[in-house]
Design a protein with these regions (language model features):
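Positively charged n-region of N-terminal signal peptides that target proteins for export
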Residues: 1-4
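Bacterial N-terminal signal peptides
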Residues: 7-16
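Short, low-complexity N-terminal intrinsically disordered segments enriched in polar/charged residues
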Residues: 19-55
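A solvent-exposed, acidic/Ser-Thr-rich amphipathic alpha-helical stretch
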Residues: 28-32, 49-102, 115, 129-130
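Structural motif
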Residues: 58, 106, 141-142
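A short hydrophobic beta-strand element
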Residues: 107-118
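Beta-strand elements of well-folded, non-transmembrane domains
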Residues: 118-122, 138
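Short beta-strand edge/turn micro-motifs at domain boundaries
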Residues: 129-158
């Protein structure tokens, strides 16, 4: 009986430590995803495609919808062109996280939602300040870095 009880206690402790370790891994991954989202916002604010490029997978499956878009950009070439057009349109843009990001990690895939405030000025002088809802899908690459597979942002109702 003592052996059985000792075995059960060891099993529970091992299972608990495994769950704890997995929870810690998810927390570490969630923090890394949040860091990637912050880098995306910094890249947008920099208006510099060279800062955006390393944050994305460069494949035929990535997708992007920005608030001004009327269609979805699919594939890295279209996504890159979308960002270049956006960066050429604005003379200033600042994206500030106001809620979230709320991150869920499942293995090598993560998704994130959040609210941001976008303050921008177009090269033609038009200014805007609006709340934006964002949704992102990320995947961990072979080097353990979280990169975007999809980003969509649209105006939140005011």
């Amino acid at each position: 009986m003592k052996r059985l009880l000792t075995g059960l206690i060891m099993l529970v402790c091992f299972a608990g430590s495994t769950s704890y370790a997995q929870g810690q891994d998810n927390q570490t991954d969630a923090s890394a995803v949040k860091d990637t989202i912050a880098k995306v916002h910094a890249a947008i604010s920099s208006l510099d495609i060279s800062k955006m490029e390393p944050l994305w997978f460069h494949n035929a499956y990535v997708m992007l919808v920005n608030p001004k878009n009327k269609s979805v950009s699919i594939g890295w070439d279209d996504v890159k062109k979308n960002w270049e057009n956006a960066f050429n349109f604005w003379s200033h843009i600042k994206v500030t996280q106001t809620a979230g990001p709320y991150v869920r990690v499942d293995g090598n895939v993560a998704w994130s939602t959040g609210l941001t405030n976008t303050n921008a000025k177009a090269k033609n002088g038009t200014s805007l300040n609006l709340p934006t809802f964002e949704s992102d899908v990320l995947r961990k690459d072979s080097d353990g870095e979280w990169k975007l597979e999809a980003h969509s942002a649209w105006r939140a109702s005011q």
